[in-house]
Amino acid sequence: MILEGFKKINEEQITRVENTLNISFPLDYKDFILSINGMCAEGELGIAIPLNQEVIAIDILYGIDTETENCNILEWTQEYKEDLPENTLIIGDDVLMGFFILVCKGEDKGVYYYDHAYNLEGSDDDGNTYFIANSFEEFINQLTVIE
């Protein structure tokens, strides 16, 4: 699968975001940001991931300094900082504006879907965050093209 990303960035830009958020990006995520710096889904939502028998259509995987409104990791993570666990980034969203989050370290490390708007059946105040993958690389490998 070939992903079309935003403009290229450098290590200094990543370090600036890491320092601002006081987070160290996992190496696989840093490599993704350096290579394509996020992406917008093309066509009919482009890609999706299976989540408990539901398919979540990815809208955007955020980048750094993208020059595209509402596509920046820093902007979204700072806006929802109070709702997020420590060492967590908001890395993207789906078409219903649920968020894909990356817990960067600790026992809960991995990628999750955060259904803050309770769009999924079964989401409520007691459970609206769903585990997807142990690492960002595993998450990317689960992406499929929507026909």
Predicted regions and their residues:
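Short, surface-exposed beta-strand/loop micro-motifs that present aromatic residues
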Residues: G98-C104
